[in-house]
UniProtKB/Swiss-Prot annotation:
Protein name stated in the entry: Phosphopentomutase
The organism of origin for this protein: Kosmotoga olearia (strain ATCC BAA-1733 / DSM 21960 / TBF 19.5.1)
Top-level EC class as recorded in UniProt: isomerase
Gene name tied to this protein: deoB
Pfam families reported for this sequence: Metalloenzyme
NCBIfam families reported in the protein's UniProt record: deoB, PRK05362.1
Length: 389
């Protein structure tokens, strides 16, 4: 048997009860994107019950969903990739990761400059595409590294591939990760952001690389691997969990490459969890407030669903979800604190089952463990009995 999780990165379905605290009142990535473009065409997801989860123009509710559907609420404080993915696999944070609305303090920047031998420019919260436009010429002239953060807990380093070769940029990220770990600050990710081209038309390349904090405790993926259930990671999953509980991984260039590589695993592996993150929704469209691009990417994914379902074996179970929101229609370019969809399909999965509002994303990881007959973890409630006879 195989379980397949596909995370539509940032495809939230409406504000969490505490969204106002995060400045995200009214956010609804799916609903607002659909409205902004005059409706979404997602017939395959609609048949799985997507339209039953929130009002999505063009995706009406169905009286008979082909699988189980519900919403998941995030128990951890935060609204970022790491927090969401860790919670899927059983880690519920007590305190959010550290943020740097005024940039990073001297006790981080000074040793970083010293160890890399390069000056830092920027050191402020910024949109990645905007800051390379703003500081790219200075970076090209001086070789200084563009360091920036966002409303997430991230230390990002942008560099032109002709000024700083990618392997060198990765080395600088490892230096930053070490300094941050030793500093006592809890920073979720260090991210390499290489770009190419000429000012002002720079393009970020797919050679991005994330250096995550290791998970704070044992995650469901590790339980699986210890019990002989392999875990195959597609996209940035391996980076998010810092390699913990991952048997094999592949990187992806874009969403469609991610779907192709997921299909490769579905065709070739006999047992295990195939765990995919499709990042374009978030990276290319959510943060750039581009609802048209976001809508097109959602429709492109939906068009591939029959292929995914058609490749599955009778005892496989597919889970489609998201890790947070990133509403492209709000003035903010940051993530939004939202509920996430939960769509479950398989030939043996009961049809038209409403799974309700799950109290934590950890219900997903707990259900995966239950499906493979692995001992439960501390957090989360399995919904295996609700979806299988």
């Amino acid at each position: 048997m195989r379980a397949i999780i596909i995370v539509l990165d940032s495809a939230g379905i409406g504000e969490m009860p505490d969204a106002e605290k995060y400045g995200d009142k009214g956010s609804n990535t799916f609903g607002n994107t659909a409205k902004a473009v005059g409706g979404l065409h997602m017939p395959n997801s609609q048949r799985l019950g997507l339209g039953n989860l929130t009002d999505i123009l063009g995706v009406p509710p169905t009286d008979h969903a082909l699988g189980a559907y519900g919403r998941m609420l995030e128990k951890s404080p935060g609204k970022d990739t790491t927090t969401g993915h860790w919670e899927f696999m059983g880690i519920i944070l007590e305190k959010p990761f550290d943020m740097f609305p005024n940039g990073f303090p001297p006790e981080i920047i000074e040793p970083f400059e010293k160890e890399t031998g390069r000056k830092v420019i920027g050191n402020k919260p910024a949109s990645g595409t905007e800051i390379i436009k703003e500081l790219g010429r200075e970076h090209e002239k001086t070789g200084a590294l563009i360091v920036y953060t966002s409303a997430d807990s991230v230390f990002q380093i942008a560099a032109h591939e002709e000024i700083v070769p990618v392997p060198e940029l990765y080395k600088y990220c490892e230096i930053a990760r070490k300094i941050l770990n030793e500093s006592g600050y809890k920073v979720a990710r260090v991210i390499a952001r290489p770009f190419i081209g000429e000012w002002p038309n720079y393009t970020r390349t797919p050679r991005r690389h994330d250096y995550s904090l290791p998970p704070e405790g044992k995650i469901a993926l590790e339980y699986l691997v210890e019990n002989g259930v392999p875990v195959y990671a597609v996209g940035k999953i391996n980076d998010i969990y810092d390699g913990h509980g991952i048997t094999e991984y592949v990187k992806t260039k874009d969403n469609m490459d991610g779907v192709d590589k997921t299909l490769d695993y579905i065709r070739k592996v006999d047992k295990g969890l195939i765990f995919t993150n499709l990042v374009d929704f978030d990276m290319k469209y959510g943060h750039r407030n581009n609802p048209e691009g976001y809508a097109k990417a959602l429709e492109e994914f939906d068009a591939r669903l029959p292929e995914i379902i058609g490749t599955m074996r009778p005892d496989d179970v597919l889970f489609i979800t998201a890790d947070h929101g990133c509403d492209p229609t709000t003035p903010s370019t940051d993530h939004s604190r939202e509920k996430v969809p939960l769509l479950v399909y398989g030939r043996h999965v009961k049809e038209n089952v409403f799974l309700g509002e799950r109290e934590t994303f950890a219900d997903l990881g707990q259900t995966i463990l239950d499906l493979f007959g692995v001992e439960p973890m501390e957090n989360g409630t399995s919904f295996k009995k609700e979806i299988l006879d």
